Amino acid sequence: KVRKVQEKLGMSRTNKAIVGPATTAKIKEFQKSMGLSQTGQVDYTTWNALGLSDDDWHNLGSYVSPIQITKNSTKNDCIETMISRAYDYLGTEYIVGASGQPGQGVDCSGLVMQALYSVGINPLPVSVIRHSQPGYEYESRNLFTSSKFKTVSYEDRQRGDLIFYSDQNGTIIHIAIYLGNDQVIEAWPGKVVVWPIKNSHRDRIAGVRRVFN
């Protein structure tokens, strides 16, 4: 939703779809021009005034991948389903704070959330709606501390594990899904890609979490 609003307001396209000061100022400016209450927030009235659709208002920013397993699915079935769902996003644009459908835009934690949803795992309080709110852009940090996943050693990593990366200060900055053979699938600035588990962009691995024990 934020990306669509920014485009309608004529703002430059970046990889961040976040309501920051610049976006808020633009919204207030538009609301003033339309005789609307200048809140800086896009409610339904402002959304319609921008010429955006009802369908997008009700559906964008709340997409959850449908569950693709059954009660008879094995652990391996679940791992492969989760990875297959992540592959559906290959080439999808990287947008900070996004967790949309394939082709709409995701960031690293948005991609992982959709993969988890496909196997019936809801990582609350982490959610697609919260993820789009200011202050929750980097949900990888909250997934890292979640009690829903088992901590395993880097040496014990297996296909389907979640790989977390940190900056030089130890702050979690990124998450990817391990594919095996030292490859991961991840959303990285640009688009969703398959890359080596370590490369020049991010090589500080903070930890590994197992989704299926």
Q: Which role does the model predict for each range below?
A:
Residues 1-17, 57, 61-77:
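Acidic, Ser/Thr/Pro/Gly-enriched interdomain connector segments
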Residues 1-52, 125-129, 178:
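Short acidic, glycine/serine/threonine-rich helix-capping segments at coil-helix boundaries
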Residues 41, 54-59, 190:
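Terminal recognition/anchoring or ligand-binding modules at protein termini
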Residues 21-28, 81-143:
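Secreted/periplasmic proteins that engage bacterial cell-wall peptidoglycan
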Residues 7-14, 28-36, 51-55, 87-95, ...:
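Sec-exported extracytoplasmic/periplasmic mature domains
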Residues 80-83, 121-194, 212:
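...with weaker cross-activation on analogous glycine-rich loops/strands in unrelated enzymes
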Residues 3, 17-22, 41-44, 73-80, ...:
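Soluble non-cytosolic domains of exported or imported proteins
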Residues 200-203, 207-213:
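Non-catalytic cell-wall polysaccharide-engagement segments
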